[in-house]
């Protein structure tokens, strides 16, 4: 037959159009190449889940609504960003959304098909704010059950906290062990002082009829901080340490425990009964402002409240079984408590921050099974121990300018180099988010809270706002635990009564208020204008 000039038979040197060799096809196939910042309008691996229930976060770059299931917070969250990047707005949004959380339940009224309806499922929270007073902005939101505690001199929102009060159903031995860790995490206490502290704590309980293996039933009396001070001194005097060691331990007593008994600290810690019982901390949304206390006492309160909540959850693990999350703790400005390393120091080099960090890391691992979530917020990831960041499921990054910070947090959430470059130029509210189930993080803009950015209320304004919240009235009934109702003179009491009577309230609550002020009677109904005709007991 006919042949071409080569060795291939004529007609075979060209295949039909529908058959091509790989070499021929390769010239027509190219993978898409994107310039930085470009994207293809197809579903990406970084796209968030498209559920329409749970906690609403905000809008993605593609205009999609981003939600996250509330159960994800059981595995904790870490939020970071430089000042002004929108971190506080994010925390306020999460707190408000958690309290207004709704869950889907089966609608039994429809017998023909399986349908679901929304049901209110508020998740209580505790905000521990060591600096500033920005979270009091939540008082302007629709949270009637909100409680704000701001322990300081002449405060209108006092807090009483007896460290020796612990949950019902828990053994005394376990509480003593945890309480010693709280002291070591808040104050520098070098050996052998921790041993004497442990012995002194056990001694004051025994003086009230406790045994270490007792389970708390709520019937026995709790000791106080001043009793611990005296007992510590007694235990120290019975040791055989030389005078120098005894002098060092005496300094620990004066500087650490003694500091909790001076001025307003005495009103906070040296009390028989706390503002809340351990169980009540799990029922309310609470903000505790710690700015006025100083670093040591503030860290002591933070660790103590975390301990009480953990103990309460452990003592009643089956309570609120219908809730996927029982409670959330917000730890703001975490660098005040948490160190860049979590290795516990020993000996004379004892560092309370390292001890506190180890305590928080351990708590992150333990409370997940108890349906407790912890949200840790700080400006810089490098200020946190790596174990803290690694043990959190949800990671949310606002603007970070330092490459070290971006690389550290980015390595824990599989962020690409391009994504981390974008983080450095984020505008306020923009964030990079990752959680379990995503291959890569995605960008979004967090929902801006209404009113955020306006000036937070001062003490007088906040007091007026809180008077309208039922939870504040309930707290007022605990007269012996709240200085806000312990007026120093009749004139001041009368002024407070005038302020109180201007607010809408329930008559029964007003009666309790009047009795607490020891008024003999009052001539007008509580919510009518007051004409001054109130007789005060002489």
Regions found by a protein language model. Give the residues of each.
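Basic- and hydrophobic-enriched, low-structure N-terminal and domain-boundary segments
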Residues: 1-82, 89-90, 94-96, 101-119, ...
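Conserved P-loop NTPase motor module
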Residues: 300, 427-538
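P-loop NTPase motor domains
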Residues: 93-365, 369-372, 431-435
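Generic beta-strand/beta-sheet core signal
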Residues: 58, 71, 80-82, 128, ...
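Phosphate-binding and hydrolysis-coupling loops of NTP-dependent motor/remodeling domains
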Residues: 1-48, 418-474
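Flexible loop/turn segments at secondary-structure boundaries
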Residues: 75-76, 86-87, 133-136, 231, ...
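Conserved ATP-driven motor cores of ASCE-family P-loop NTPases powering translocation/secretion/packaging/pilus
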Residues: 83, 93-96, 167, 348, ...
């Amino acid at each position: 037959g006919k042949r071409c000039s080569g060795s291939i038979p004529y007609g075979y040197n060209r295949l039909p159009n529908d058959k091509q060799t790989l070499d021929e096809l390769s010239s027509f196939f190219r993978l898409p190449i994107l310039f930085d910042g470009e994207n293809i309008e197809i579903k990406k691996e970084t796209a968030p889940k498209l559920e329409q229930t749970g906690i609403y976060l905000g809008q993605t770059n593609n205009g999609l609504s981003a939600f996250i299931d509330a159960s994800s917070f059981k595995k904790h969250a870490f939020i970071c960003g430089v000042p002004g990047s929108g971190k506080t707005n994010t925390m306020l949004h999460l707190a408000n959304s958690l309290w207004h959380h709704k869950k889907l339940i089966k609608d039994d009224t429809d017998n023909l098909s399986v349908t679901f309806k929304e049901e209110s499922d508020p998740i209580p929270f505790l905000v521990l704010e060591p600096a500033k007073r920005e979270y009091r902005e939540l008082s302007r939101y629709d949270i009637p059950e909100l409680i704000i505690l701001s322990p300081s001199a002449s405060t209108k929102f006092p807090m009483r906290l007896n460290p020796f009060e612990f949950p019902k159903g828990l053994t005394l031995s376990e509480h003593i062990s945890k309480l010693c860790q709280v002291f070591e995490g808040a104050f520098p206490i070098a050996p052998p002082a921790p041993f004497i502290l442990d012995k002194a704590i056990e001694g004051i309980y025994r003086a009230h009829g406790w045994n270490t293996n007792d389970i708390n039933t709520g019937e026995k009396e709790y000791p106080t901080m001043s009793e611990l001070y005296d007992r510590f001194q007694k235990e120290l005097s019975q040791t055989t340490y030389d005078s120098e060691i005894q002098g060092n331990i005496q300094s620990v007593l004066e500087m650490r425990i003694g500091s909790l008994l001076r001025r307003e600290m005495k009103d906070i810690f040296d009390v028989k009964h706390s503002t809340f019982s351990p169980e009540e901390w799990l029922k309310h949304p609470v903000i505790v402002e710690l700015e006025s206390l100083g670093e040591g006492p503030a860290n002591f309160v933070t660790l103590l409240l975390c301990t009480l909540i953990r103990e309460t959850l452990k003592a009643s693990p089956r309570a609120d079984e219908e809730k996927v999350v029982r409670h959330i703790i917000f730890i703001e400005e975490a660098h005040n408590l948490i160190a860049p390393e979590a290795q516990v120091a020993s000996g004379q080099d004892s560092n309370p921050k390292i001890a506190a960090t180890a305590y928080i890391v351990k708590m992150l691992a333990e409370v997940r099974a108890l349906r407790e979530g912890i949200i840790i917020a700080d400006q810089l990831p490098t200020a946190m121990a790596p174990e803290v960041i690694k043990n959190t499921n949800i990671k949310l990054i606002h603007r970070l300018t330092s490459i070290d910070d971006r690389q550290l947090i980015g390595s824990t959430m599989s962020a690409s180099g391009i994504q981390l470059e974008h983080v450095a130029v984020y505008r306020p509210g923009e964030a990079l988010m990752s959680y379990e189930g995503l291959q890569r993080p995605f960008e979004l803009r967090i929902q801006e809270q209404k009113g955020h950015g306006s000036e937070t209320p001062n003490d007088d304004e906040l007091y007026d706002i809180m008077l309208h919240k039922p939870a504040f009235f309930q707290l007022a009934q605990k007269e012996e635990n709240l200085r806000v109702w312990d007026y120093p003179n009749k004139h001041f009491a009368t002024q407070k009564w005038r302020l109180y009577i201007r607010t809408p309230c329930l008559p029964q609550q007003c009666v309790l208020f009047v009795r607490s002020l020891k008024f003999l009677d009052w001539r007008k109904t509580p919510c009518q204008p007051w004409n001054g005709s109130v007789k005060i007991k002489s």
